[in-house]
């Protein structure tokens, strides 16, 4: 009962730890990780993903499926909160998680460094499995409710969409990322 009170939840399996907030990484950290693995960089950029459960699940999928980092804006994304950390199942402590001030500007800078920027969007004509993952790239995913902002979408070299049944309307953002990776 004491642990339930301290944590304000019963979902703890009898274990708790007090830890410092994890530090955010830099883009250079993510690019160094790719270089150390002798792989072309694969970054995931999240535009407006504010739900901490989705944010954590997306970090987890990014780690599991070979991405070298997850990038999002400081003001338009969920923080690495305890809920996001829990949803990431520890992935946020193993993969560079980067916060930037301006996502469109960051994507343009990455393009100048030789990375291709691809977005998941209903306007896309190709499916994500047609992506060339052998080239250095950033895969951009927008929020469930809004999708990518116009400036982010316009920065993309190409848009891809996941073909789904019309009656489904949309996918959860973390599920869409998992399918695309």
Question: Where does each model-flagged region fall?
Answer:
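Post-transcriptional modification and biogenesis factors for structured RNAs
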Residues: 1-181
């Amino acid at each position: 009962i004491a642990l339930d009170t301290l944590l304000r939840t019963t979902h703890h399996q009898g274990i708790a730890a007090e830890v410092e907030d994890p530090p955010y990484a830099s883009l250079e950290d993510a690019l160094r990780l790719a270089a150390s693995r002798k792989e072309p960089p694969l970054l995931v950029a999240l535009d407006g993903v504010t739900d901490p459960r989705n944010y954590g699940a997306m970090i987890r999928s990014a780690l599991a499926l070979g991405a070298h980092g997850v990038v999002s804006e400081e003001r338009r994304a969920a923080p690495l909160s305890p809920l996001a950390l829990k949803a990431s199942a520890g992935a946020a402590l193993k993969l560079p998680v980067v916060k930037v001030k301006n996502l469109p500007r960051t994507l343009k800078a990455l393009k100048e460094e030789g990375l291709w920027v691809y977005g998941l969007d209903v306007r896309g004509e190709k499916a994500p499995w047609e992506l060339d993952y052998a080239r250095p790239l950033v895969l951009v995913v927008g929020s469930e409710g809004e999708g990518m902002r116009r400036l982010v979408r316009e920065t993309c070299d190409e848009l891809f969409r996941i073909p789904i049944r019309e009656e489904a309307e949309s996918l959860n953002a973390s599920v869409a990322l998992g399918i695309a990776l």
